[in-house]
């Protein structure tokens, strides 16, 4: 078992970059694989989750070179060129891989099966199997959870699906199926979710219409190979945005961070709490907006986090809770029940961990209350969740004594270089088994 010890530090200073965006990296492989022609992707995240997606397409006959220095070269086989995999596709810890692949595989002529690790096998999949079945797909789960068994050769028909809650994974799953369905597939969102798939469709020259919260796609298009630069992942940058905000005298610059407006909830929330975050040198990598982020220490105050921010910061809440633990006053969050269905029950994991470190925190069914103050040293269990592990590593920098975090191996799913990057800013994080 891999564990971290994070020791208190004086201040954090320096300039870093973070690895490529995980959501965009997954999608670059998917669309590159079914494109006509070759795609060159730079800035690819070579974490275990994205490698699971890459290996899935290699098992379906797609030639992919790399990753080599964050570059992958994908020799696309076209929309109808995938071949039946010889084995069950193992998605590891990656819910994104499983849910997006399910949409694509539901439209193929061959049978397939998707499985994953112990954590992934507990995650809900009816949210994709039900709408796929409405389209005519033959998709079965085990009591609503993986593994997923897909019978190929089914004729799919477009549907108009109104999303019951914000979920970029469900939306993307149905858009991928819609690329093969008879007639139009329409997806209406009542709350904003990540729009990387819609942007990626445009990058690969596939026709998609978006109007008044409804996305429309049909099968009358092809993806075409392209060149793509992937920006740094704001979900990875989040750890250092919070760290610089809560560690006195800190001054940190993070370059080349994706600032897609469906992902910048963390910046809005921390700014509302009083953080000093400056967005510099705004530009674009293809369809995705990018900037450099300059963060300096500022005393934070507790707030009631608006429900509208939940889908815009869903992956960043664990480290936002660390910021709340250091703020003056109470912070509350509601409307975030989805946090209980992630790689772990993130509300439960954070409440337990914060209480272990002397912070008063209470969990609700759909949120949390945190009374800010100071963080003590101690030991917490990440429950095998990469974002919980990294969040408590950040807490160690401002704790009164070292913080030990157990069960951190899954940090490699999203941020393999986390400890190295953190220590460049003068963190003191050590790994041990």
Curated annotation (Swiss-Prot):
Recorded metabolic or biological pathway in which this protein acts: Metabolic intermediate biosynthesis; chorismate biosynthesis; chorismate from D-erythrose 4-phosphate and phosphoenolpyruvate: step 6/7
Active-site residue list: 315 (proton acceptor)
Entry's EC annotation: 2.5.1.19
Keyword Nucleotide-binding: no
Subcellular location: Cytoplasm
Record flagged with keyword Nucleotide-binding: no
Annotated positions binding 3-phosphoshikimate: 22-23, 27, 167, 169, 315, 342
Reactions catalysed: 3-phosphoshikimate + phosphoenolpyruvate = 5-O-(1-carboxyvinyl)-3-phosphoshikimate + phosphate
Keywords: Amino-acid biosynthesis, Aromatic amino acid biosynthesis, Cytoplasm, Transferase
GO molecular function list: 3-phosphoshikimate 1-carboxyvinyltransferase activity
Residues involved in phosphoenolpyruvate binding: 22, 95, 123, 169, 346, 387
InterPro entries, sorted: Enolpyruvate_Tfrase_dom, Enolpyruvate_Tfrase_sf, EPSP_synthase, EPSP_synthase_CS, RNA3'P_cycl/enolpyr_Trfase_a/b
GO biological process: amino acid biosynthetic process; aromatic amino acid family biosynthetic process; chorismate biosynthetic process
Family: Belongs to the EPSP synthase family.
Complex formation: Monomer.
PANTHER family according to UniProt: AROM/DEHYDROQUINATE SYNTHASE, PENTAFUNCTIONAL AROM POLYPEPTIDE
Described function: Catalyzes the transfer of the enolpyruvyl moiety of phosphoenolpyruvate (PEP) to the 5-hydroxyl of shikimate-3-phosphate (S3P) to produce enolpyruvyl shikimate-3-phosphate and inorganic phosphate.
Record's protein name: 3-phosphoshikimate 1-carboxyvinyltransferase
Organism: Legionella pneumophila (strain Lens)
Annotated gene: aroA
